[in-house]
Amino acid sequence: MRPIKLTISAFGPYAKETEIILDELGERGLYLITGDTGAGKTTIFDAIAFALYGEASGNEREPGMLRSKYADPKTPTFVELDFLYQGQIYHIRRNPEYMRPKDRGEGMTLQRADAVLEFPDDRLPVTKAKEVTKAVTELIGLDRGQFTQIAMLAQGDFMKLLFS
């Protein structure tokens, strides 16, 4: 599984819609994401894990905490991920549960968590959050725990790797 494009909106420190073209990094399979503390590096991992599994990459972040506190209340919170698996491109869009302005009148309303997985062939999309997580797990053969241990080396785990 190789991430191609990641789009995040009102997610973590990213207040506005931000697109990261991961495919431009090449096909070597190992990427190093560096930057200053608080620059949003871990959020990139969180967004990929959230798109695939509905949970952040670390155990200390609940889905309800993923909405950006810097975002305009009207900006929707979502993550989209295009990824390549066995020569086929899949698309996932997922949003956490969060409060948003009502469509009519004043006040806020709860935006329920939602997800959709689109296949590269003529299969119908999977449209329920739990079903998307199940379909992703079956497709790539890794659950969230396995994925975060194998595909990502999150902040704080680097020293564990060095001394193992």
Predicted regions and their residues:
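Extreme N-terminal "head/tail" segments of very large remodeling/mechanoenzyme assemblies
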Residues: 1-149, 157
